[in-house]
Amino acid sequence: MTIKAIIHKSCRSVQSAPLQMVLVLNVAIYVALKALWLVGGESGIFDRAVNATVIENSFAGMLAHPWSVATYAFVHLDFLHLLVNMLWFACFASVICSVRDRSNVWWLYLTGAVAGALACMAVGGITFGLTRMAGASAAVMCILGAALAYAPRYRIKVALIGDVPLVVVVAVGGLCLFTETGVSMAAHVAGLAAGVIWGLSWRRSQRQVRRVTREAMIRESARKALLDKARTLGYASLSQTERIQLFDMSNGFKKD
């Protein structure tokens, strides 16, 4: 297999299975950092790796490591933090995969990460002093917000309980993810807001598609009625207005 084929296959895997890929990336990076911490000793390699990937609430830090606005969302330094984030990510990402194209999970994850990073720098630099932030919480909140805004009536199957409304699951997940304060809270709110905007934009586009489809069905029904009248009673039975309508509608369908 050529390098080009390997790259193409990898890109297709990333697009077709974003939920699994995000989980694998987060776990792999956590394991890699733990290995650096254990093996690196006092060499400082662990600290350098962390400093290069987490976000600082300062624009100077962002300019030094611009990629950190996205990479910090894949970095967890605590196992419990990783576990909670990935459990809620899997829960809400599965909802998105059920109601929208799977590739949206990637866009939501990265959008939430960037929104959280910007909130961290904007709010944290003013009120909380210099801090660093790592973890997928803002990205998960973005996916949570999008799922709730787009499919509020969705129901999730929970073992031993049955179907649970998404609103209830979101409430529980929100409480778990909103336990932080300060900079982290600002990042979570920013991620949630970004997700809600995504979800509402999806609903708006869906309503537009439904309206266009409904209007097309009405036009088609009227066109068929005029054609039936012309076949049954003859073209001469159509009024001048009906002939113009039939001509316009027929030309419209040909253009479509």
Give the positions of each predicted feature.
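A detector for small-residue-rich transmembrane helices and their helix-helix packing motifs
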Residues: 1-227, 233
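C-terminal regulatory/interaction regions
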Residues: 219, 224-256
